[in-house]
């Protein structure tokens, strides 16, 4: 657990702060920020030698002067419970039916997507490899090579716009358009 989450949970509880110069502050934690600057109220300040005591209504302690912070065990238990509930809610949120890729609730990347790379089911947009309607496939095979042609051709390779026999790898380039 992070010290900042521990301090934020400890707001409203009694803590003891020891500074690098040896002074200690016991008081009620009002608030803390990202730099571990702390506001305390109803504070008892103890000198380095523990021979002088001061009662202070409220004080501000800069985070980079802090050496040690002592918090009650109940705060540690509260932080552990909060982290567990956050973890379960985060996991439940991520367990929705989103696919890989875009995260928009649809199939995303891979074989099932109609557009983009992969196999694709739309004859206007064949992906790499084969697919239905011979889109981008090679010689009517479901797993052709190359990128395929634009509209429903059975020839593989990059090819031209519509049904041209000119193309790259894969397919049967001997037939005419």
From Swiss-Prot:
It is found in: Nucleus. SUPFAM superfamilies: Sm-like ribonucleoproteins (SSF50182). Pfam families: LSM (PF01423). The keyword Cell inner membrane does not apply. It comes from the Eukaryota. Keywords: mRNA processing, mRNA splicing, Nucleus, Ribonucleoprotein, RNA-binding, Spliceosome. Its main location: nucleus. Disulfide bonds: none annotated. GO terms for cellular component: nucleolus; P-body; spliceosomal complex; spliceosomal tri-snRNP complex; U4/U6 x U5 tri-snRNP complex; U6 snRNP. Residues 2-75 form the Sm domain. Residues 110-122, 146-163 have a biased composition (Basic and acidic residues). The keyword RNA-binding applies. Residues 126-139 have a biased composition (Gly residues). Gene3D superfamilies: 2.30.30.100. Residues 87-177 are annotated as: Disordered. GO terms for biological process: mRNA splicing, via spliceosome; nuclear-transcribed mRNA catabolic process; P-body assembly; spliceosomal snRNP assembly. GO terms for molecular function: RNA binding; U6 snRNA binding. Component of the precatalytic spliceosome (spliceosome B complex). Component of the U4/U6-U5 tri-snRNP complex, a building block of the precatalytic spliceosome (spliceosome B complex). LSM2, LSM3, LSM4, LSM5, LSM6, LSM7 and LSM8 form a heptameric, ring-shaped subcomplex (the LSM2-8 complex) that is part of the U4/U6-U5 tri-snRNP complex and the precatalytic spliceosome. Belongs to the snRNP Sm proteins family. Plays a role in pre-mRNA splicing as component of the U4/U6-U5 tri-snRNP complex that is involved in spliceosome assembly, and as component of the precatalytic spliceosome (spliceosome B complex). The heptameric LSM2-8 complex binds specifically to the 3'-terminal U-tract of U6 snRNA. PANTHER family: SMALL NUCLEAR RIBONUCLEOPROTEIN SM. This is Probable U6 snRNA-associated Sm-like protein LSm4. It comes from Dictyostelium discoideum. The gene is lsm4.
